[in-house]
Design a protein with these regions (language model features):
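Proteins that catalyze or organize thiol-disulfide redox chemistry
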Residues: 1-26, 31-56, 63-110
Length: 110
């Protein structure tokens, strides 16, 4: 599923790939059965290309990984969390247009 430099984030690699990242990280919490998740996926892929080198982007399948979504109280999907310095700095729940996600990301780069 992951491509375009998108990291497949799991409960096992979350701390290393997200919390210890030297760049901000956008994590897309999704599931295969979720229609809005499928709708937002192409936007996330575009952002991975556009923000390459500035922001790390990861996707986490909530059906295969339950500990991390529970830890961050992800109850609805899609949920996009932006982490910076190991902390959540933005939370977007539900389908969001690209410009809303871009605005959230731009606050945390540079």
């Amino acid at each position: 599923m992951a491509g375009n430099g998108i990291v497949e984030v799991t409960d096992a690699n979350f701390d290393q790939d997200v919390l210890k990242s030297d760049k901000p990280v956008l994590v897309d919490f999704w599931a295969t059965w979720c229609g809005p998740c499928r709708a937002i996926a192409p936007i996330v892929e575009e952002l991975a290309t556009e923000y390459q080198g500035k922001i790390k982007i990861g996707k986490m399948d909530v059906d295969s990984n339950s500990a991390t979504p529970m830890r961050y109280k992800v109850t609805g999907i899609p949920t996009l969390l932006v982490f910076k310095g190991g902390q959540v700095v933005e939370q977007l729940v539900g389908y969001k247009p690209k410009d809303a996600i871009t605005q959230a990301l731009n606050k945390h780069i540079g």
